[in-house]
């Protein structure tokens, strides 16, 4: 059987908001030989002046538009889909996450990795993690959904930070200093691991560095999701510079 000359191991269809400028380069940085990423943009109005009241409804628009992005990317016959948008993958707790995953798979007729499932798989890969803290670019209403999901998966959420982005595009503008400050605020002896959600926050390398400072797992959503996709497809290549998840598990 003939194979794609570049994606001879796997073609990944990547689904991400049209406002997102981070997930595509992040995933490409973690790409291994024989795997190619094919980005399909989910139409997303760039709402400015987002509030706690409007964030949930604004991200639901992304969920509704995801099916169009799937139909588009499936024309290149990818073997697997990787979800590059995390908020909606946590909505509705454990059952809501599974329903969203199933909706994607039923439309595409191929497997898929989503941020919520990938994050919990990553935490379990490290082992021994019970108490977590997390940060997001979201608002408290969305953080409540993330908290609910992790707690239904058996983790205790000790604390969380919502950075309250002004708009969807401005998520990528949070500085490294701001993110370091958030990590320092989250860390403590009462926390076994820290998780970062929100795929437009560039934290794949910062999280890897923070693991060294804190001597505990720091899971970046983009790292977890791409790792999950690779391992789900039997690709066990180890990568360095992105934290223990990709180099050890």
Question: Which residues fall in each region the model found?
Answer:
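Glycine/small-residue-rich loop that forms an oxyanion/phosphate-binding "nest" at active or ligand-binding sites
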Residues: 66, 70-112
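N-terminal glycine-rich anion-binding loop in soluble enzyme alpha/beta folds
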Residues: 1-67, 135-143, 147-175
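Short, flexible loop segments at boundaries between secondary-structure elements
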Residues: 165-168, 214-238
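Conserved beta-alpha
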Residues: 100-166, 246-247
């Amino acid at each position: 059987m003939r194979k794609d000359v570049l994606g001879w191991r796997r073609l990944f269809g990547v689904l991400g908001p049209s406002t997102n400028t981070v997930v595509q380069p992040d995933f490409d940085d973690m790409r291994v030989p024989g795997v190619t990423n094919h980005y399909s943009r989910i139409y997303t109005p760039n709402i400015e002046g987002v509030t706690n009241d409007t964030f949930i409804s604004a991200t639901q628009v992304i969920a509704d538009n995801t099916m169009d992005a799937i139909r588009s990317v499936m024309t290149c016959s990818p073997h697997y889909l990787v979800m590059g948008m995390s908020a909606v993958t946590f909505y509705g707790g454990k059952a809501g996450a599974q329903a969203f995953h199933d909706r994607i798979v039923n439309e595409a007729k191929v497997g898929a990795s989503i941020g919520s499932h990938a994050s919990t798989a990553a935490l379990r890969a490290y082992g021994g993690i019970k108490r977590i803290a997390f940060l997001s670019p979201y608002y408290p209403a969305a953080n409540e959904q993330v908290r609910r999901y992790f707690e239904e998966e058996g983790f205790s959420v000790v604390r969380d930070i919502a950075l309250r982005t002004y708009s969807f595009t401005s998520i990528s503008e949070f500085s490294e200093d701001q993110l370091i400050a958030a990590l320092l605020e989250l860390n403590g002896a009462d926390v076994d691991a820290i998780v970062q959600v929100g795929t437009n926050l560039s934290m794949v390398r910062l999280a890897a560095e923070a693991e060294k400072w804190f001597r505990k797992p720091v899971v970046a959503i983009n790292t977890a999701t791409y790792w999950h996709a690779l391992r789900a497809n039997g690709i066990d290549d180890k990568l360095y510079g992105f934290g223990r998840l990709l180099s050890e598990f």
